[in-house]
Amino acid sequence: MDSESQLLEGAVEKIGLIPRSIIRTINRFQQQLFPDAVEYFIQEFRVSRSQVLVSLQCLLTLIIIPLFIHFFAKTVFLTPCIEYVWNTYKTDIFLNSYQQEQALTEMRNFEEILYFDLLVQSNEEPVTQEGLPFTFLQHSQGSVDEEKTTAPITAYAVSNMGNPETATIAPQHLHGSVGGKLESEFRFTNPSFVGKNNVTGATTITAAIPLQKKLVDLAQSANKQSIAALTNLFADLLTLFSLIILFIRLKSQIIILKSFLIETFYSLNDTTKSFMLIFSTDLLVGFHSPRGWEIFLDFILSRFGLPHDENIILLFVATFPVLLDSVIKYWIFRYLNKISPSTVATYHAMIE
């Protein structure tokens, strides 16, 4: 208990009006005048070594244990449980409207690419019709009409891939509700089967299998994204809770770690400290920092499955860097100017 209290006393050093480097130099000079200076230096070396070991141990504990808890919880029980509950009790595959809009945009792009490929590869005359046209044959019950026509296929169809050659689907929204103007049933066929008598009483659509497979891929991808977002949310909350517990349990070690990091920073020369300050401020609140904050906020929203609102992102980018810049300037004026005035002078000289 006594050694720990001595270690804490050596780790915590109050900030005064006179720089600590001057006070430390005067104290060491006075201590060298006494006959027991050798024992004091040995004791000081032991305290310094213990401070380094405790700081490294505390730092590794704060890094390794939360990462291990996050990986173990996410892999072992969070992912299987959330996947089971989501696939069993949830009817929607989309977590929010932004995710649905992304899927629809990707589907429209795929329709345009598929339409372009059909125009390039087809020997028929190009058909100009709004949406993605497919050439199909209309059949009546028991008879075949040789007239060809076209009709667009929307991105709200949900496929039934039971047969690799023909698959029957109905126009539906991805949420599961029937929508659209078409209420008839579609039977998608392979282009090699068009014109044969294997389809009666239905509409045979040419080259619709790629579109059908793309719908299935988008639905599966959106479902996986929703499960991953919920898993990340609960795993990060559990990691944050474990980190709070570690901060409470390792309070004395964290004080030693904080003092060790501060002493390490102050032991650097003025040029190095000024360079680190300039690099940090330019990275966080510099001219090019808004784009970085946008990417960071976009990553956070995507990780937790939150909708992307441009107004919120722009408001955050416009206010948070300004607040952070004010805090950094206050810290430089209030604390660093008293502890190391030469560093502040070098910092302003490098900025100018």
Swiss-Prot record:
The keyword Nucleotidyltransferase does not apply. GO terms for cellular component: chloroplast inner membrane. It is a multi-pass membrane protein. InterPro entries: CemA. It is found in: Plastid, Chloroplast inner membrane. Keywords: Antiport, Chloroplast, Hydrogen ion transport, Ion transport, Membrane, Plastid, Plastid inner membrane, Potassium, Potassium transport, Transmembrane, Transmembrane helix, Transport. It holds the Pfam family CemA. Disulfide bonds: none annotated. GO terms for biological process: potassium ion transport. One of its GO terms (molecular function) is proton transmembrane transporter activity. The chain crosses the membrane at residues 52-72, 227-247, 312-332. It catalyses: K(+)(in) + H(+)(out) = K(+)(out) + H(+)(in). Contributes to K(+)/H(+) antiport activity by supporting proton efflux to control proton extrusion and homeostasis in chloroplasts in a light-dependent manner to modulate photosynthesis. Prevents excessive induction of non-photochemical quenching (NPQ) under continuous-light conditions. Indirectly promotes efficient inorganic carbon uptake into chloroplasts. Belongs to the CemA family. PANTHER family: CHLOROPLAST ENVELOPE MEMBRANE PROTEIN, CHLOROPLAST ENVELOPE MEMBRANE PROTEIN-RELATED. This is Potassium/proton antiporter CemA. It comes from Oltmannsiellopsis viridis (Marine flagellate). The lineage of its organism: Eukaryota, Viridiplantae, Chlorophyta, Ulvophyceae, Oltmannsiellopsidales.
